[in-house]
């Protein structure tokens, strides 16, 4: 309850002090969740998690005080209407970026991730990947871009480089794993790399894709971790080798797994495709070479999700003949997520309608405060146009 309340506080705070207090309050229940109910190496994982996140966010209090001294207020909306010197923006943005990059996490601040995700109980892994990872991305959108726009533009190449490294490195690490929890953990590194990349493209396709990808990644990754938990109750193992040949004996379970795995590598028609497609379009709009470098990350996702799926479905079965298929409680848990995977993949207009007004305001305000011309096609703010483009129809905008 404390953890969920603090998470809600972070995403709803309009005051820097409250934002900071809720941000720090999340650490204690998360540490206890890992250290008390985690796996065999839970103490090491919990300590590593709290040391990394404390090191990343300790200086955030300095930023909070600095904005109060310079801007005369803790109110985020009031500070957004003020202009700060470039030097002030740069050092405050660097501190904020460090805290947010650790929380996402971005390469090279990701080394706490496999230990925390791997040792946390399934409920903890779901919260870490589906919700807490989004705090860093939200921090960039709520504080980084509005309060320090010129610094955000100045450091954008560095953040983009870190994001691309996260996408490619996370994909390679996920492909090399034999543990299902670690595969999903490293896949989150790659997916969140796409999110941060989309934010720092500074075009509407990129930012739209980033926000909708945050929603979709939470659904898909949460579902995959839930299925790993169901699997562990039956086999007692998180290893691929301990869960082979399930397709014949638990077909309903593997049907759900296949759907969420395909969503995990952004197969067209699933929810993750929408955000990833928009981010790739935004990347090619920003720079053709940037788009070309990012594309292999999407291909890696297919490789690391299809490999375990193939082995778990058609491999040589072990003790799966004794298993029962899904219970009523498990159906009730997974059906809503399966519905969202398909609905948001086939009809993304629901999310686009909700987010477009805020994103339009964010991008236009950012453009007006940065002394460069950013490409914004106002037709692209129509969720109908974007939804049609995803279905292959002509939009008349800049999308192919």
Whereabouts are the PLM-identified features?
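Hydrophobic transmembrane alpha-helices and their helix-loop junctions in integral membrane proteins
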Residues: 4-19, 28-310
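Cytoplasmic/organellar membrane-interface segments at the starts of transmembrane helices
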Residues: 250-252, 305-400
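Short phosphate-coordinating micro-motif centered on Lys-Gly-acidic
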Residues: 24
């Amino acid at each position: 309850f404390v953890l969920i309340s603090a998470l809600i506080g972070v995403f709803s705070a309009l005051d820097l002090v409250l934002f900071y207090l809720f941000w720090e309050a999340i650490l204690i229940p998360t540490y206890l969740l890992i250290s008390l109910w985690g796996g065999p190496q839970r103490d090491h994982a919990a300590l590593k998690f709290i040391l990394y996140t404390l090191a990343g966010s300790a200086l955030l209090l300095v930023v909070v005080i600095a904005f109060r001294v310079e801007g005369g207020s803790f109110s985020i909306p009031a500070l957004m209407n003020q202009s700060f010197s470039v030097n002030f923006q740069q050092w405050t943005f660097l501190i904020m970026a460090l805290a947010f990059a650790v929380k996402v996490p971005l390469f090279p601040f990701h080394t706490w991730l496999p230990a925390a995700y791997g040792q946390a109980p399934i409920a903890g892994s779901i919260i870490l990947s589906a919700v807490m990872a989004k705090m860093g991305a939200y921090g960039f959108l709520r504080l980084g871009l509005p309060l320090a726009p010129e610094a955000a533009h100045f450091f954008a190449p560095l953040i983009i480089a870190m994001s691309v490294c996260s996408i490619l490195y996370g994909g390679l690490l996920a492909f090399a794993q034999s543990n299902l929890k670690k595969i999903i953990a490293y896949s989150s590194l790659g997916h969140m790399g796409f999110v941060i990349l989309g934010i720092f493209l500074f075009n509407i396709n990129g930012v739209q894709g980033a926000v909708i990808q945050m929603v979709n990644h939470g659904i898909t990754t949460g579902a995959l971790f839930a299925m790993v938990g169901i699997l562990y109750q039956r086999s007692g193992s998180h290893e691929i080798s301990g869960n082979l040949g399930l397709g014949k004996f638990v077909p309903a379970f593997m049907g759900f797994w296949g759907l969420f795995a395909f969503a995990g590598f952004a197969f067209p028609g699933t929810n993750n495709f929408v955000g990833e497609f928009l981010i790739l379009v935004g990347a090619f709009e920003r720079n053709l070479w940037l788009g070309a470098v990012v594309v292999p990350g999407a291909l890696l996702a297919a490789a690391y999700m299809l490999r375990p799926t193939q082995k778990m479905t058609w491999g040589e079965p072990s003790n799966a003949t004794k298993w029962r298929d899904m219970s009523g409680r498990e159906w009730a848990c997974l059906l809503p997520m399966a519905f969202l995977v398909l609905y948001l993949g086939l009809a993304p207009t629901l999310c686009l309608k909700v987010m477009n007004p805020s994103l339009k305001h964010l991008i236009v305000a950012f453009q007006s405060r940065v002394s460069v011309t950013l490409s914004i096609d106002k037709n692209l703010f129509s969720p109908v146009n974007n939804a049609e483009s995803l279905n292959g129809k002509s939009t008349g905008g800049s999308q192919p």
